From Swiss-Prot:
Reactions mediated catalytically: 5-oxo-L-proline + ATP + 2 H2O = L-glutamate + ADP + phosphate + H(+)
Oligomer status and interactors: Forms a complex composed of PxpA, PxpB and PxpC.
Any GO BP: carbohydrate metabolic process
Organism (species): Burkholderia pseudomallei (strain K96243)
Protein's recorded name: 5-oxoprolinase subunit A 2
């Protein structure tokens, strides 16, 4: 199942005022990726940061995507905030609307949506939330690509309702037997070479090792590298270098499709 083309995405613009999450290396990471998930103000991001990040993406030729989260600035969107369905719909519309206007102002379009943190993980296992999310996107723009894991309720609902979907592989996260990511405590930074080898194996062989030491099949359209992972820049460089050295093209889904490469056949 060797891949000839793959997307490389990262969360960008995750700060607020003078505050930054991670190493603050958005400018260095942006040219290495093909899709940027831009924080839209509720877990991180403010008007100045959003504008700057959209411009960075435009300058680098990187696809712009919205990265909406729960209304949880203090907890960085990692807390499951109890909201009514209508309030959550309004929050998502608000965040996407903000990014789309900044994108329009800078002469680019929003190509995808990737929920952040607790919203992403809760939707992955919650059918009602996934359906609400997908139906909201369909009303806003049925062509928006939704990023999610294949081993998730979100993926199933998106396919059922006909929303374009981009399946993710997490380079800097561990996997469980069911193909979903698990969160484990690590001492120190990830080794860039090991991360690059993990990505290459997934791209070439379609396999990934789980935290239990077993191998499972994995398929995906996009590789996610978190910009707030310690040493994120080194991980991004090693991953990109490994992919290009093995002849695997890095391209956003819209670019791949424009060149006749279907995402599910890349």
């Amino acid at each position: 199942m060797r891949k000839h083309s793959v997307d490389l995405n990262s969360d960008m613009g995750e700060g607020f005022g003078p505050w930054k999450i991670g190493d603050g290396v958005d400018e260095e990471i942006m040219p290495l990726i093909s899709s940027a998930n831009i924080a839209t103000g509720f877990h991180a991001g403010d008007p100045n940061i959003i504008a700057r990040t959209v411009q960075l993406a435009k300058n680098a030729g990187v696809g712009v995507g919205a990265h909406p989260g729960f209304r949880d600035l203090v907890g960085f969107g990692r807390r499951d905030i109890g909201e009514t369905p209508q309030a959550l719909v309004n929050d998502i519309v608000y965040q996407l609307g903000a990014l789309r206007e900044f994108a329009r102002f800078h002469g680019v379009s929003v190509q995808h949506v990737k929920p952040h943190g607790a919203l992403y993980m809760r939707a992955a296992r919650d059918e009602a939330l996934s359906r609400l999310l997908v139906e909201t996107l369909q009303q806003l723009d049925p062509a928006l690509r939704l990023y999610c894991m294949e081993a998730s309720v979100t993926y199933r609902i998106a396919r059922e309702l006909g929303q374009p979907v981009v399946r993710e592989f997490y380079a800097d996260r561990d996997y469980g037997r069911n193909g979903s990511i698990v969160f484990t405590r690590r001492a120190g930074r990830l080794d860039p070479r090991q991360v690059a080898d993990k990505v290459l194996r997934a791209c070439v062989d379609g396999r990934v090792a789980t935290v239990d030491g077993e191998d499972i099949d994995i398929d995906f359209d996009s590789i996610c590298l978190h910009s707030d992972t310690p040493g994120a820049l080194a991980l991004a460089r090693a991953t990109r270098d490994a992919l290009t050295a093995h002849g695997i093209r890095i391209a956003a889904p819209a670019t791949a499709e424009a060149n006749g490469i279907r995402i599910d056949e890349a």
